[in-house]
């Protein structure tokens, strides 16, 4: 792999500095004595990837097994799990190859390793982009189900969902390939950052609007039962906590990665930014943690899915 030192798990494209930007690599004395670098061990990185790989594979298998789950909503959830599976799988593969190379158990020509590195980079980037897209698609699907409940099944049909899924996958592969090919252009990094911010704003606006509507609905029910304040406030607090957790996890897991991209453009040679650059492996680990958390938030809350999952696990034994 085209990797060096403590950051050997950087995507090949992000392990190099764009030619339009000053050199990213900082010497130890440039980053300062107080520079904090969180080391992610090979074992931890590999373990997180394997847990995410197994968990998301179970989600995909469960949805595929049960025909009752072949709906637009579960189609998006299944594709989110598949994206997270690819994110984890590509990082597990890269880590395994690196460990085998370091141990001398694997010998390969530089050209072969470079091609493998490029393939892994494209898979990782495309799965990251598609994962963000499917998180947004799930938010849009839930929004339509609440605000257009009577027309939901005519608006969100399975053929339309499949076309949306196909468009997301094709766009993710195309743009990730362009990203790998033109990683030395600042515009590419800015586009990725803008895309992340757009997904964050989209999810925040939709979920906040859904929470407001749910609170209004609870308030109306409370009025009918003459118990407005306790019910409304309790429901609003629970909804606010749920929303905070959902958006907080998304921002915590994805934010550092895109902060890294932003700082590459804004301050590639600043000592403080250099400290942040040193923790890129941590940022990748956080994205894999998000891949572990996603099924808990979007999939396993379904009683039907949990029941089918038990059947899948029983059959596997």
Curated annotation (Swiss-Prot):
Q: Which domain of life is it from?
A: Eukaryota
State which residues carry a glycan (glycosylated).
29
Phenotypic consequence of residue 40 to T: Correlated with fair hair and light skin; partial loss-of-function
Q: Where are the transmembrane segments?
A: 38-63, 73-93, 119-140, 164-183, 192-211, 241-266, 280-300
The consequence of residue 155 to T is: Probable risk factor for developing melanoma; reduced expression at the cell surface
Sorted alphabetically, the Gene Ontology BP terms of this entry are: adenylate cyclase-activating G protein-coupled receptor signaling pathway; G protein-coupled receptor signaling pathway, coupled to cyclic nucleotide second messenger; intracellular signal transduction; melanin biosynthetic process; negative regulation of tumor necrosis factor production; phospholipase C-activating G protein-coupled receptor signaling pathway; pigmentation; positive regulation of cAMP/PKA signal transduction
Cytoplasmic-side stretches of the chain, per the record, are 64-72, 141-163, 212-240, 301-317
Main localization is membrane
Q: Transmembrane helix: is it a keyword of this entry? A: yes
The protein's matches in PANTHER family, at most eight in alphabetical order, are given as: G-PROTEIN COUPLED RECEPTOR (PTHR22750)
Q: What biological function has been recorded for the protein in this entry? A: Receptor for MSH (alpha, beta and gamma) and ACTH. The activity of this receptor is mediated by G proteins which activate adenylate cyclase. Mediates melanogenesis, the production of eumelanin (black/brown) and phaeomelanin (red/yellow), via regulation of cAMP signaling in melanocytes.
| Family designation | Belongs to the G-protein coupled receptor 1 family.
* Name of protein: Melanocyte-stimulating hormone receptor
What lineage, starting at the top, does this entry show? Answer: Eukaryota, Metazoa, Chordata, Craniata, Vertebrata
Q: Which gene encodes it?
A: MC1R
């Amino acid at each position: 792999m085209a990797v060096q030192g403590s950051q050997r798990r950087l995507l090949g494209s992000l392990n190099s500095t764009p030619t339009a930007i000053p050199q990213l690599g900082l010497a130890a004395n440039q980053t300062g004595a107080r520079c904090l670098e969180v080391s992610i061990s090979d074992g931890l990185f590999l373990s997180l990837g394997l847990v995410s790989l197994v968990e998301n594979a179970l989600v995909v298998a469960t949805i595929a097994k049960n025909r009752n789950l072949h709906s637009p909503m579960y189609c998006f959830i299944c594709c989110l799990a598949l994206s997270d599976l690819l994110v984890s799988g590509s990082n597990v593969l890269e880590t395994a190859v690196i460990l085998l190379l370091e141990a001398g158990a694997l010998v390969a020509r530089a050209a072969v390793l470079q091609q493998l590195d490029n393939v892994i980079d494209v898979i990782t980037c495309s799965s990251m982009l598609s994962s963000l897209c499917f998180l947004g698609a799930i938010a849009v699907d839930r929004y339509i189900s609440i605000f257009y409940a009577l027309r939901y099944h005519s608006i969100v049909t399975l053929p339309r969902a499949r076309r949306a899924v196909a468009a997301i996958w094709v766009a993710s592969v195309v743009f990730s390939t362009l990203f790998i090919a033109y990683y030395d252009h600042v515009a590419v990094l800015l586009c990725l950052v803008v895309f992340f911010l757009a997904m964050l704003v989209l999810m925040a606006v939709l979920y906040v609007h859904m929470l407001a509507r749910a609170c209004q609905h609870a308030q109306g029910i409370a009025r009918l039962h003459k118990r407005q304040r306790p019910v409304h406030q309790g429901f609003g607090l629970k909804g606010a906590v749920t929303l905070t957790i959902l958006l907080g996890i998304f921002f915590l897991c994805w934010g550092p990665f895109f902060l890294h991209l932003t700082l590459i453009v804004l301050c590639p040679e600043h000592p403080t930014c250099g400290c942040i650059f040193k923790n890129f492996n941590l940022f990748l680990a956080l994205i894999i943690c998000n891949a572990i958390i996603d099924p808990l938030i979007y999939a396993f809350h379904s009683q039907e899915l949990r029941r089918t999952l038990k059947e899948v696990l029983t059959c596997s034994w």
